[in-house]
């Protein structure tokens, strides 16, 4: 649990910052409160893409959560560095992360730095993990072999894994914990980049219920041979995070979804 009485605070591991673009170069976005390991940012008043960067892939590698596009490693994307209290950005035409007058939001997570080698699975991975908050960033190269495993670095099995092929146009796969009957361990998935209902298909079956992720069906979406992938893994932590499902009731007074705390970030 994250317990303020013991010196811990949720804001030490997750925080949201807002800013208004000014076209400047080398602009420091501060107030995060820590050096972020995963930054997800978006213009709030424009249709610019979502941008996702992390400390494992580096500050020059951008993925787009609203697109299936491969990772872009263009030298100058406008995201300059991860800093001790946030990050530094510049306005670059075509990237638009500090466009004059545009309002922006960035969600920031703290993991475990740039990552270390993890050999818990049959695939060696690079993992940046924060065991206290149940969050890790996992980089690995696929094998194409059913039953391959990869370590995630967490103290409990992930309840949620968001996986993206970095070097090809694969969808963002959102995979749930297998014991959740609403999100079964049978290849079921959601995708960030579409409005599609839950899917189920070849190349997507994964088991999360152990110290490693097991690629039951190691297809292109999650473990194609010689392809590079990034996975963001989560499990619930009392007082900090909660993952699950709920059923709507088509009523203005909708269902109450208990988390045990007031959330700072909700993804539905």
Language-model regions, residue ranges each:
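Surface-exposed molecular-recognition determinants
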Residues: 1-268
